[in-house]
Amino acid sequence: MEIKNITVAGGGVLGSQIALQSAYKGFSVTMWLRSEGSIERAKPKLERLRTIYKQTLEAMKTDPAAYCRGLITLTTDLQEAFGDTDLVIEAIAEIIDEKDAFYSSIRDILPQQTILCTNSSTLLPSAMMGFTGREDRFLALHFANNIWKNNTAEVMGTPKTSEESYEAVVEFARAIGMIALELK
């Protein structure tokens, strides 16, 4: 499966970094946020990250027009965020009931082929796979903070994750400049 359009759910520290890193590497990115207030809080985070990228990454210094091309759309609309996405990376609060409510809210909107990933660092994907309605296309993709320099991404499936979904996520992680740590 080819991943072109990604949606990052959550605009906190890691959600913002995942969105910008993905846009930096040329993916079309939508950030879904719960409220207009969340959108307003995410904008300065993204701008600060763009500044960091411009100051620290060689590729940005040599050809800044080729990177961070404004490919990030911020929205609170579920249909806009999830109706045409290939990959969802959920980076919301580490509260199991909130994750359940989130996955339940998008389940019927997602295209059939969409793969779902959690960025959770404290909850195993097997604890959440039942929330998704697509256990074969659900796994963890966990990033380290400051992903532009700590470029590792842990990829962890569940007993029900398909090999195709797992490999597509490993390929995506590599495509955005991560060293994919495959946890099986």
Language model regions located:
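Internal alpha-helical scaffold of NAD(P)-dependent oxidoreductase catalytic cores
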Residues: 134, 152-184
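NAD(P)+-binding Rossmann beta1-loop-alpha1 motif at the extreme N-terminus of oxidoreductases
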Residues: 1-52
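Conserved N-terminal Rossmann-fold NAD(P) cofactor-binding segment
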Residues: 30-85
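Phosphate-coordination loops involved in phosphoryl transfer and adenosine-cofactor binding
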Residues: 2-5, 69, 85, 113
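A structural alpha-helix within SAM-dependent methyltransferase catalytic domains
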Residues: 20-23, 107, 129, 170
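Rossmann-like NAD(P)(H) cofactor-binding subdomain of soluble oxidoreductases
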Residues: 87, 92-152
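Acidic/polar active-site rim loop that often engages polyanionic ligands
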Residues: 24-27, 83, 146-156
